[in-house]
Amino acid sequence: MQIYSEYYEKIGPRKLRLLVKRRLLFASTWLYINNYILLSIIMKLQTKHMILLGFVAVVVVFIIFMLTRKKKEGFSIGNIFGKVKGAVTGTVGKVVNVVKPQGYKPEFVNRVNFGKFWACPEGTTDWGSEDKQCLVSQYGPMMWRNKGGNEWGWSCPAGSAPNNSDDWNQKCVQGYSMKKLIDGQWRCTDTEIDTGKDWSNSDWFTAQQQCDRGNNKVFTRRMYIDGKWQCPDGTWDTGFTWSDGENGGKQCKYYP
């Protein structure tokens, strides 16, 4: 302090004030320039690099944290990428399953031998095809068939009714038929149940479910028509009679 005091005494008051002003001006200028440079850097980082630097910082902190965990967890950088890859592929698989769901797959079985002929087992419906013989499932596809009078087209086999579905394999529901003109009356066969549905009280689909065949989808019995016992329209006589034991009720087979 003495040295500085002696120096300031030598230069005089006027020169001292001038020196102080110069140093203050230099200090303020230097501080202004530093602040300007720092603010410029911060502004550029905010617009271009702050997000990236923040993400890098989070990743670095996460990796450091995971590396400090117990070795028994078997953590490594490779495990991170493996988990990420598994998560991504698993998500894609779920999306594919949503976009392409499994369609309805009806079940079919083959016809069996009844001694005199081959026919579908009871509880199924003859689908009139060699590769799709007897429908077990509730729903099935339309078939290219003779709809009557040598008129061919896509339709549901006899013993099934059209179903209101966009799935081709669910276009037909088995176990239903239309009433037939039997002995002058529109009625169901003796083994069918009248559902009460008709064109006056049902839509186009359910109106064709007039007779429920229940478990008797393949065979029915002879009916007293025109003064004699005979098979109704839409069936053919199998030759079985009540004396044939368990086959006694299989007197008339429905056409597919």
Swiss-Prot record:
Domain of life from the UniProt record: Viruses
Gene: A262/263L
Subcellular location: Virion
Record PTM: Stabilized by 3 intramolecular disulfide bonds.
Induction note: Expressed in the late phase of the viral replicative cycle.
GO annotation, cellular component aspect: viral capsid
UniProt entry keywords in alphabetical sequence: Capsid protein, Disulfide bond, Late protein, Virion
Stretches the record annotates as Hydrophobic: 24-44, 47-67
Cleaved signal peptide residues: none
The name this protein goes by in its record: Minor capsid protein P7
Domain observations: The hydrophobic regions might anchor the protein in the underlying inner membrane.
Function: One of the minor capsid proteins that constitute a network internal to the major capsid proteins and outside the lipid membrane. The minor capsid proteins glue and stabilize the capsomers.
Lineage: Viruses, Varidnaviria, Bamfordvirae, Nucleocytoviricota, Megaviricetes
Disulfide linkage: C120-C134, C156-C172, C188-C211
Subunit architecture: Interacts with the major capsid protein.
